[in-house]
Every structure is written in structure tokens, then in C-alpha cells.
Amino acid sequence: MSERDAQGATDIEGIMNLLPHRYPLLLIDRVLDFQPHEHLASIKNVTINEPFFVGHFPQKPVMPGVLILESLAQACGMLAFKSVQDTLTDNDVLYLVGIDKARFKRPVQPGDQLRHDVSVRRVTRGIWIFEARGSVDGELAAECEIRCTVRTV
């Protein structure tokens, strides 16, 4: 499988080349669409085998809201890193600076495919500001505004 196809999709190998996250906190499975400095769409296939379902909640498994936000933040990271990947070094990391206006509209459960749609609102003084939405079967599950910055470590 190739890293990229004609629509800007990226497979898991390409994702792991850009994001430092690994199991159990790598929360993106595939990038579906990418427009540099504008938009990225990706998915997380949610399965009952996720480690967080052991305790959240055993009788009615629901993906924790904080992990939904983390998956959206990782999609924002992919958008930023894919947009500037020609200028990145191996020591560059994207740090989460803040999350505002977070709202949860429906639970995300095993068997769901969580779709991330993230867009750049603006980049100001090194801070990327994104609009982020997560949906399942076209129904809004969560939305927020995410701020990130690239730093060399």
C-alpha cells in the first residue's frame, strides 16, 4: 500500500512518519483528504478492543470525550505537519496549546467510524488555530477549536 494516492490520502505508515504517537494513543487510522494549509479529513475505526473500553464503561462502552478531542487534535497535527513537511526536522513536535468551545453531541461506541474534519482558521505568531469536527455516519459527535504550535525539541 502506498503512503499517498491522488486525493492526498495517507495510510498508517505515512501517519506514523509524521506523528510521534503510538499505540495505544495513535487515534488516526487513515487520512482521506488533504488540502495544504486548508483542510484534512481522516478516520478512526473504533473497536471494542480499545484499551479504554475496559473501564469506560464495562456495561455500556463509550469512547471518552477527552480521547475524541485527542483524535481531533491529532488530525490537526496531520494537517499542520503535512502542510509544512518540507521544512520539518526530525526534532520538530506539534504541541497542543489549547482547546476551546468543546461540545459533545452524541456518544462514540465500538463499531463506529469516527470521521475527523479539521480546517485551518488562521496561523498567528506560530500558533495554528483549527476548527475541528468529529462525526459518525454523518452525525456530529463533537466539535471544538484547537490551538497548536510546532516546536523543536
Swiss-Prot record:
The family this protein is said to belong to: Belongs to the thioester dehydratase family. FabZ subfamily.
Gene Ontology cellular-component terms listed: cytoplasm; membrane
UniProt-annotated location(s): Cytoplasm
Name of the protein this chain belongs to: 3-hydroxyacyl-[acyl-carrier-protein] dehydratase FabZ
GO molecular function list: (3R)-hydroxyacyl-[acyl-carrier-protein] dehydratase activity
Gene: fabZ
PANTHER family, A to Z: 3-HYDROXYACYL-[ACYL-CARRIER-PROTEIN] DEHYDRATASE
Keyword Zinc: no
Catalytic activity from the UniProt record: a (3R)-hydroxyacyl-[ACP] = a (2E)-enoyl-[ACP] + H2O
